[in-house]
Amino acid sequence: MCIRDRNIENTLFRLLELGALPIVNENDTVTTEEIGIGDNDTLSAIVAILVKADLLVLLSDIDGLYTADPHKDPTAQRINEVPAITPEILALGGACGSSLGTGGMRTKLHAAELVTAAGTDMVIANGSAPQLLYDIAAGRRAGTRFLGRKDL
């Protein structure tokens, strides 16, 4: 782990020890090109890995990962669980962002790739239904769950 990552990790853990809720935002006005990650989905994955989170939850404008774009294809089916990130899963990410973000499903799948490789589960759920966070915290099915590798 490089010094920068260690400093970030120490800062986040100290803030958590103090009872603070760290807010980390890639689109912050103080973000510079030299330190920019590129999007909040990737940044959240990096932070989840650094703090050794049990679960990363990403909120979107749809209910999870679908077999096709549900905004365009009425036959699209939500995928409840993804045991591994495969080329087929990555292909479902498409190339464009959601109406609310810059990266859309593509960057969420990249985040899933990062955290699941580190052994952390991830959920993509609908941000317009914040009560889903209670279901997710209770272990109930909501959105799409990506399973972290357990062979680490």
What name fits each language-model region?
Residues R4-L152:
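C-terminal catalytic "cap/lid" subdomain
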